[in-house]
Structures are given as C-alpha cells and as structure tokens.
Amino acid sequence: MGAFTEKQEALVSSSFEAFKANIPQYSVVFYTSILEKAPAAKDLFSFLSNGVDPSNPKLTGHAEKLFGLVRDSAGQLKANGTVVADAALGSIHAQKAITDPQFVVVKEALLKTIKEAVGDKWSDELSSAWEVAYDELAAAIKKAF
C-alpha cells in the first residue's frame, strides 16, 4: 500500500462528520445492511436482540464507535503509515470468533452507509479512502487476536 495521503484522511474525516450529523438514521442503515447480508450477525450484537431500533443508545453508540475507529485509523495511516488496534478489540473479536467474511460484510455495510450519508459527494476516491482505512483497521484487529 502506498502512503495514506492528507487528502484521503480529509475525505474520511469529512464524511465521518456527515455520518455523525444523523447517527440514528445511519446506524439503522448500517445494521440493517449487515443483517440483510448476514442475519446470524444478530447474535453477535446484544443490542440487536430486539431488531434495529434507532432509539437504542447502544446501537447508535456502537455505530459511532466503529465509524470513529475507522476515521482514527485514517489518522494513524496518515501519521504513521500503519494502524495499531487496542488489544481489547482483538480479544473481543477473537472471543466472538469473527471471520474474514464477517469483516467483509461490515465493510460493505460501512461503505453503503457512508455513501448514503454523503449523497452526491460520493466518489471512487472517497470509497477507496474508507476501504483502505477499514482494511487496515481490520488487519490490526486480527493481529491483536
């Protein structure tokens, strides 16, 4: 991978702000997309036991945390060229036996959500910046298993 540029970091950061502008709505988009592709994922998230409820603070909090981690990964990539994940994140994903295909489902849902959040500002360059930041975060989480 080449160096993560300042422009890529700015694209991720600005689109994260678009996501944050309506976290309840975009949390629903995100988790609905995950459950459409992988219904069994419902069992991996305790806050999905009653479905996708935008008024559930755990649902919106988890979405904001995940998208924030990807944004932070973009910052780490720009500053250091690598992403380091907290060991606890690796431990949680290891305990739940998260697989590569599950990481892909989350990435696809994340991209769909950001695309909806930014509307006509969506571009291949924006998609690529989020993909790189997410992929590097996922790799760091797996390394911390």
From Swiss-Prot:
Residues that bear Nitrated tyrosine: 26, 31, 134
Transmembrane annotation, as ranges: none
Keyword Lipoprotein: no
InterPro entries recorded: Globin, Globin-like_sf, Globin/Proto, Leghaemoglobin-like, Leghaemoglobin_Fe_BS
Binding site for heme b: 46, 65, 93, 96
GO biological process: nodulation; response to cobalt ion; response to nitrogen compound
Keywords of the record: Acetylation, Cytoplasm, Heme, Iron, Metal-binding, Nitration, Nitrogen fixation, Nodulation, Nucleus, Oxygen transport, Phosphoprotein, Transport
Gene Ontology terms: cellular component: cytosol; nucleus
GO molecular function: heme binding; metal ion binding; oxygen binding; oxygen carrier activity
Binding positions for O2 per the UniProt entry: 62
Known partners and oligomeric status: Monomer.
Function: Leghemoglobin that reversibly binds oxygen O(2) through a pentacoordinated heme iron. In root nodules, facilitates the diffusion of oxygen to the bacteroids while preventing the bacterial nitrogenase from being inactivated by buffering dioxygen, nitric oxide and carbon monoxide, and promoting the formation of reactive oxygen species (ROS, e.g. H(2)O(2)). This role is essential for symbiotic nitrogen fixation (SNF).
Protein name: Leghemoglobin 4
Organism field: Glycine max
